Amino acid sequence: MSTAALLTLVRSGGNQVRRRVLLRARGLQDDRWVMPTCHSSTSEPKWSRFDPDGSGRPATWDNFGIWDNRLEEPILLPPSIKYGKPIPKVSLQNVGSASQIGKRKENEDRFGFAQLTNEVLYFAVYDGHGGPAAADFCHTHMEKCILDLLPKEENLETVLTLAFLEIDKTFARHAHLSADATLLTSGTTATVALLRDGIELVIASVGDSRAILCRKGKPMKLTIDHTPERKDEKERIKKCGGFVAWNSLGQPHVNGRLAMTRSLGDLDLKTSGVIAEPETKRIKLHHADDSFLVLTTDGINFMVNSQEICDFVNQCHDPNEAAHAVTEQAIQYGTEDNTTAVVVPFGAWGKYKNSEITFSFSRSFASSGRWA
């Protein structure tokens, strides 16, 4: 749709779009749509963005591929004019999250989401190992580090790369000044997403936590695991003087210790080729087709494949229920690890609810065949 057509629609007969624009212009926020912490058959039903009339049915779709007039959700006017089509606002209050300890003694996963500027939203998961210190450090300091870089750099991929490297250096200084020797072996994965103007999505990652975009009901993988199984990663480890050894389960580890080749922290393995530089990816969202972004830690990824994650989320009433459903499914499949999921809804949320779910009874046993 052209910019002129969009403005004409806003000024004249486009009641739904006009109302959203007016709400935005008056500075009204969408904090009226409070997400329930979880969804269950026994909990009192609450109206939300995903069931505005309390009917138990999702909102229908208008010809833009975004929510119809039962939703008083504003569009982002400047980006909509810039891109020539309505771009719905992504509200943090509609983001779903869940984190479960599993069978571990401690939950070393961390996650967060925040509005950094008027244009930029932040979402992240961190999966710590060797204690929670590195994950805690990233969870505490990553937002501010990115925020400090945004005025200096337009390219969000560059922003995230610089932020990862700076956080890693700062954690190293912190560890060397500390009397706690365990900090030298503490590390974490990091998968961070920035969303600018509701349409530009940029992902950076180190380790094996993942980001998946559900487009037309199918998963689009936005990250690639950094493991010694990757030829390029293994070659770097060897060139730096490190080695790869396999454990009793046939899983490769750097120097027999770490299952990933990139991380934040793990200071004792820096000279063996474990680096903090992330791989990045930038995509343009299509809200008519894109249902959600989901960030997951490996307690989920090792048990639930990408299509299954999309299917489970698509069957859920709201993102918070979806995040809990995904973590619970990994536990049912037999994971012993911490499980964390962050679900960010986009314009096509609920559009692909008819996706079929294939349940694997063999994986529902505690052993699941993976840990036998």
Swiss-Prot record:
Tell me where in or outside the cell this protein is found. Mitochondrion matrix
> Region annotation Critical for association with the BCKDH complex: residue ranges?
46-61
Matching Gene3D superfamilies, A to Z?
Answer: PPM-type phosphatase domain
* Any one Gene Ontology BP term: regulation of intracellular signal transduction
Q: List, alphabetically, the InterPro entries matched.
A: PP2C (IPR015655), PP2C_BS (IPR000222), PPM-type-like_dom_sf (IPR036457), PPM-type_phosphatase-like_dom (IPR001932)
Checking CDD domains in the record gives:
PP2Cc
**Domain of life according to the entry:** Eukaryota
Per UniProt, Mn(2+) 1 binds at 127-128
Organism equals Bos taurus (Bovine)
Catalysed reaction, written as an equation? O-phospho-L-seryl-[3-methyl-2-oxobutanoate dehydrogenase] + H2O = L-seryl-[3-methyl-2-oxobutanoate dehydrogenase] + phosphate; O-phospho-L-seryl-[protein] + H2O = L-seryl-[protein] + phosphate
Residues annotated for Mn(2+) 2 binding in this entry: 127, 298, 337
Q: Which residues carry this modification: Phosphoserine?
A: 248
Q: What protein family is recorded? A: Belongs to the PP2C family.
Instruction: State the taxonomy lineage.
Output: Eukaryota, Metazoa, Chordata, Craniata, Vertebrata
Which GO MF terms does the UniProt record name? Answer: [3-methyl-2-oxobutanoate dehydrogenase (lipoamide)]-phosphatase activity; metal ion binding; protein serine/threonine phosphatase activity
Q: Name one Pfam family in it.
A: PP2C
Quote the record's cofactor note: Binds 2 Mn(2+) ions per subunit.
Annotated gene? PPM1K
Keyword Acetylation appears in the UniProt entry: no
- Descriptive protein name: Protein phosphatase Mn(2+)-dependent 1K
Which cofactor does this sequence's record say it needs? Mn(2+)
* GO CC aspect terms: mitochondrial matrix; mitochondrion
Q: In which pathway does it act?
A: Protein modification
Quaternary structure, per UniProt, is: Monomer. Interacts with E1 and E2 components of the branched-chain alpha-ketoacid dehydrogenase (BCKDH) complex; this interaction requires colocalization in mitochondria. Interacts with BCKDHA but not with BCKDHB of the E1 component. Interacts with the 24-meric E2 core composed of DBT monomers with a 24:1 stoichiometry; the N-terminal region (residues 49-61) of PPM1K and C-terminal linker of the lipoyl domain of DBT (residues 145-160) are critical for this interaction, whereas the lipoyl prosthetic group is dispensable.
Q: Which SMART domains match?
A: PP2C_SIG, PP2Cc
